[in-house]
């Protein structure tokens, strides 16, 4: 799956760049009045509306897109998302008025909807959900890196200003869009199909016969071992509207949505507010670098101790709160920037942890439709936080956006309160899961609900309680000192060798 991981990273990197380059376009070639706002004669309110319209359509179409992906070939649907996103992104190069910009932003949110939750769903086809956190975190870094790269590359596009009669930002929209269109076709060869059970033959419908064949992610004994590991948690079966309604009525969905709402809103708010601090002091250390470091450190730990996800999420959110308070009340510019770095460090792992916890909870409880619907709803409804920060807070709150020592102070304090709601939701989720558990739906087949097959899974199943200090210390002690002594590891090694030997005998 390593080369396929690169494919997911690249597609998310490029689509994130297409989504966010409107922010760079507002500052390109300002001295010549060839920036986006000057060319289209936009007001700050027009900017806030255009940014918010993206999230409105994203919220509306996130769930339908992910449900379609669960019914169709996932690699084809993911390639469709990239193609449509790139096509709309290319159209930004021809924008001539404010209303057309707003329309394209709405269309962009509509066509890109389902990409982020779709990647989380795609991962559950190949990995147990309890081990997807670090992989989701790795893909999430693509968005962070693209934000930095778009800013750096924009210098080159500014030099192309007036070349061929196009402004620099139009060249930027055009080239990013065309590169994305090329990538969308390459994904048909690059991304893997759904994994098959050993011995199963892939049948293709007539209307998909023209598509290129993608190599299987795993073959031979590796595929057999992988299938035995995955079948304990992966529940593929046809779903109906009634199944979807059961997912929507599951109380576990709503604490996760509130968790996502707060951290995503803070992420967007940090981008808006952070630019004010960065412009004032011109630092050399990047908040994005701190963000990446946190993802690399925390998300693997949240997978290893997946029953402690509430702890990891809450700790990261507390760091964000501390950072917001520092950057709000500190007087010195560098002190305020250090607070911004704290927000970046806390923000990095929270979104991947939230998505991984959603996949883990709803895969076991509702199967494939649970993952598809829950990840889309958490991502979609959670992005209402983005609408809040772009339209109601920061630049969308004129009195709070006035220049002065207290600029954006009220918006920051509102975000502190929203983060408190996210932390409370995580703790409520952990407590209620402790009280009521997460039993599988009675509709899931019993033969896929067997005991864990491998040593890692056995260790996961016997993790101590996540809500006690003893549980935390025991988990850490086992990880540092006794991981190789786990007898279940020897059992699974023996079982895997036996299965591999049996497979060789059958071939002979």
Language-model features: locations:
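Primarily marks hydrophobic transmembrane alpha-helices of the MFS/SLC 12-helix fold
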Residues: 78, 312-313
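Cytoplasmic helix-loop-helix junction between adjacent transmembrane helices
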Residues: 104-142
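Helix-breaking motifs and short loop linkers at transmembrane-helix boundaries and internal kinks
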Residues: 18, 41, 64, 72-73, ...
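Flexible cytoplasmic loops linking transmembrane helices in multi-pass membrane transporters
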Residues: 1-3, 192-273, 281, 374, ...
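Residue-level signature of mid-helix packing/kink "hotspots" within the transmembrane helices
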Residues: 20, 54-63, 113, 148, ...
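Extracytoplasmic gate region of multi-pass secondary transporters
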Residues: 23, 242-302, 310, 351, ...
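Central mid-sequence intracellular linker of multi-pass
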Residues: 130-143, 162-246, 410, 415-416, ...
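Conserved MFS/SLC helix-loop-helix module at the cytosolic interface between two early adjacent transmembrane helices
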Residues: 59-99
């Amino acid at each position: 799956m390593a080369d396929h991981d690169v494919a997911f990273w690249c597609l998310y990197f490029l689509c994130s760049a297409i989504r966010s380059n409107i922010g760079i376009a507002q500052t390109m070639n300002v001295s010549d009045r060839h920036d986006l706002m000057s060319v289209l004669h936009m007001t700050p309110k027009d900017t806030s509306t255009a940014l918010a319209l993206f999230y409105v359509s994203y919220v509306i179409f996130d769930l339908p897109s992910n449900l379609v992906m669960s019914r169709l070939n996932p690699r084809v649907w993911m390639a469709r998302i990239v193609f449509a996103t790139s096509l709309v992104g290319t159209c930004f190069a021809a924008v001539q008025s404010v209303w057309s910009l707003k329309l394209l932003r709405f269309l962009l949110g509509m066509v890109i909807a389902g990409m982020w939750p779709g990647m989380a769903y795609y991962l559950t086809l190949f990995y147990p959900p309890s081990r997807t956190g670090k992989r989701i975190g790795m893909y999430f870094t693509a968005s962070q890196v693209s934000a930095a790269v778009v800013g750096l590359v924009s210098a080159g596009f500014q030099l192309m200003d007036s070349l061929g009669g196009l402004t620099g930002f139009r060249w930027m929209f055009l080239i990013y869009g065309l590169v994305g269109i090329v990538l969308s076709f390459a994904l048909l060869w690059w991304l893997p199909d759904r994994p098959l059970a050993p011995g199963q033959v892939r049948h293709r419908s007539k209307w998909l016969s023209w598509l290129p064949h993608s190599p299987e992610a795993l073959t031979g004994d590796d595929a057999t071992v992988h299938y035995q590991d995955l079948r304990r948690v992966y529940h593929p079966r046809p779903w109906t509207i009634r199944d979807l309604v059961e997912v929507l009525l599951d109380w576990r969905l709503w604490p996760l949505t509130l968790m996502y709402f707060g951290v995503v809103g803070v992420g967007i708010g940090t981008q808006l507010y952070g630019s004010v601090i960065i412009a004032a002091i011109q630092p050399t250390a990047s908040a994005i670098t701190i963000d990446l470091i946190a993802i690399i450190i925390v998300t693997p730990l949240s997978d290893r101790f997946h029953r402690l996800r509430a702890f990891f999420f809450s700790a990261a959110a507390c760091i964000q709160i501390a950072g917001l308070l520092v950057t709000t009340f500190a007087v010195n510019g560098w002190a305020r920037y250090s607070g911004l770095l704290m927000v970046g460090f806390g923000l990095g792992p929270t979104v991947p942890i939230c998505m991984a916890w959603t996949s883990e909870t709803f895969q076991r409880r509702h199967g494939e439709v649970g993952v598809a619907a829950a990840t889309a709803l958490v991502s979609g409804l959670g992005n209402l936080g983005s609408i809040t920060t772009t339209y109601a807070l920061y630049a969308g709150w004129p009195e709070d956006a006035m220049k002065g020592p207290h600029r954006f102070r009220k918006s920051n304090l509102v975000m502190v309160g929203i983060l408190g709601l996210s932390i409370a939701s995580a703790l409520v989720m952990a407590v209620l899961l402790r009280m009521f558990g997460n039993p599988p739906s009675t509709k899931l087949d019993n033969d896929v609900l067997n005991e864990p097959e491998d040593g890692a899974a056995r260790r996961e199943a016997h993790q101590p309680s996540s809500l006690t200090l003893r549980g935390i210390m025991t988990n850490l002690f086992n990880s540092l000192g006794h991981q190789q002594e786990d007898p279940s590891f020897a059992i699974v090694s023996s079982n895997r060798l036996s299965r591999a030997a049996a497979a060789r005998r059958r071939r002979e």
